[in-house]
Amino acid sequence: MRRTINLAVIAALIITGASAEVMVSATTVESHTDGKSIGLNLWGENKHYTDDLTVNVSGLGVNGNKYHNNVTGIYALDGSQVAIDKNVNVTVVNPAPAESGEKRRPDLAHYYMSGIYAGYGGVTNDGNNDDTRITVQGNAKVDAIGVGLQANKDGYIRILGGADVKTHPLTTSDTYSALSEEGFVYVNTGMDGLKPGAKDVNMYGNIGFINKNYGIDTNPHNHGSEISLGLTTPKSKLVGGVLNEFDESNNNPHHGGLRLYLQNGATWRNEWLGAEREYPTQGRPDTANYLYTGSKVEHLIGGATEGSRGIIQAVDARPITINNYAGHTAIDYEKGAPAAENGKGEVVINHADPGSSVTLRSSVDALKAHANAEIPGLAENQFVKKIVYNGYTKGERNLGVNVHLETGVISPTLNAKLSPDDFDTDGRAVVSNKTVLSTSESEIVSGAKSALASSVMQMRADTNDLQRRLGDVRLNSDNQGVWGKYIGGKSKITDSAYVNQNYNMAQIGYDTKRGNWIIGGAFLYGTNNSDYALGSGSGKTAGLAIYGAKQFNDGRYLDIIAKGNHLKNDFTVHNSLGTSLSGDYRNTGASLSLEYGKRIKRNNGFYIDPSAELILSRLSGESFDARTNTGSTVHINSDAVNSAIGRLGIGIGKEAKNSNVFLKAALAHEFSGKMKSTYSMAGEPTTNSVVDLKDTWLDLELGGSWSFRPNTYLYGTFTKNVGSTVDTSYRVDAGIRHNF
């Protein structure tokens, strides 16, 4: 047996009555045995860790004739108070986990294997103690055989940051990522379990609520058993079923159970992991009432809007029961999931808050025989029956139900929006003559269309006027010049496509004076990264430009620039049900821009700068094949995109001998800019998509130039637009020019 505790610093020892609080900085606790093994074993003790805490434990739950050795990371009882100011990392290795409890019953095995355990608080046979509390201000990472976070009688485990809790399904007993037996587990939901945070939370393992109403040390049932999980980020996920013995036995007077915040793309994959529950054998009047018959959730709080909803992946054939529901949630039924079978995978909602909704998503292929897409409304009606709204039978009309049913990879999606009265007398959802039926493009087509729009956005990002490209050419005092600049920004499309693009480009150029003209050329190279509604992509662009800028003696100026660009993009998009499409394509772009304006000087260096600009461009079409993760091929043909943008601007500025600052507003209009694409594949009808960029918007530009040496000046602009389909959240141009 080896057990060591490495303490970096003991900062203070505070004695208060019969108890002591020990403040400790960064700590690593190790306990490695061939039997019982506990890292931190705390009975009525106070510990305060001011830095990270790491606990590594290994042992054997079963060894010889010992079949319930306790192998646990942190074991706090009898009113212990544990405060961890930063993060906690617990690893429990147990190759032979306990198979039962002291009475040789598998339903007791969980008491003897935990990552973090808090319990036996309040009044016990050891006396009258305080509640047992473990509070982690930072994040918790737990990898344990058995139970990740276990709070028994009057025990509190509060993880105020994020969490990564991983358990390992066993065949000998049921295990849980979080378990409550008249205790409290709060993860990313504040001190009271009611304030969801914004940290990533990943829980791999079932959730359990145990009704200890038998044997020794029965719980007094003074309050409910509670677990509150804040899954509020796209990277957050719960995998596991939810056992609630109080609901299973129809005896839940305190309404204890799981409070699940499922928002912003977070996922709950509902499937029971590991061994099924076995019949309890001691002191219960009807043992069958304590078996797992489906996940039961006390409160499920979805997104505030449909755009911020979370996702339930329905896998287990047994029903999900939600006692109290609020917000918006998508429920996915994937191909091959038992829940997708006819009559399986029901979601029962007993009460819904006003304005809440659920959206069922699946495919005709996943639903198989009971989904006939040829008859309007039939497949939707069979699918929507998976929703049972018991509140409807009691007079509620609060739950909205939507259906999205994929009919293929590129084939249109079937949609249904039920009316508030589209439920039968038993509360089961039905399609009626009040239901709104429609079709829309598939999520794969929508994603591919967005990926194609990335090239158009790349072309837009490379447009510039004279000030953005060269700064204040008035400061150009010599015959020749070289310059370089950085272009970076963020733009997005949310109308008819969804693209969120970040780009970074570098441009270098050389020019020379020819009378009143500055004639030159430039090379550009840039990269971008794009996020789509369901997917992502990246791109590169390289281009050459020739330009001429003429300065008139009366302040007028004319700027002409012609450019050619080569663009390359790759992408992967997917739908909600796991089908993905990957491809790459190349385009060639050409553009011609003409800008004419006049700087009208006023007193004290102030000036007004009216201008007009016309930008003509063409992005070549492309025909290519993209492949799905199932091996099929989608042929995509994208037409060429012609664009004609006109801009009328007015600027005001102030110039000095060696500097210039200005503010400019320009009304812009896209006269063309329509992007058409066609998608085809074996076994499905050809479909089309259109992104129409014809639009009017306002460009706002702030910039200036500063000559810090006789032949060298810096220049830069900050640009943003308002009301555009291609929304420029920001663009920064920053350059340096040297004349000689």
Which stretches of residues belong to each language-model region?
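Outer-membrane translocation/initiation segment of Type V secreted surface proteins
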Residues: 21-22, 327-345, 359-511, 587
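Extracellular beta-strand/loop-rich repeat segments of large surface/secreted proteins
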Residues: 200-204, 208-386
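Solvent-exposed, glycine/polar-rich loop segments of beta-barrel outer-membrane systems
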Residues: 496-502, 533-535, 568-586, 620-642, ...
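Residue-level detector of the transmembrane beta-barrel scaffold of outer-membrane proteins
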Residues: 206, 241, 481-485, 518-522, ...
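Outer membrane beta-barrel transmembrane domains
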Residues: 545-550, 602, 635-740
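Outer membrane beta-barrel translocator domains of Type V secretion systems
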Residues: 439-604, 718-719, 724, 735-737
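Extracellular beta-strand/beta-solenoid scaffold signature
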Residues: 28-43, 56-79, 95-124, 130-133, ...
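Outer-envelope beta-barrel architecture signal
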Residues: 199-201, 236, 478-482, 504, ...
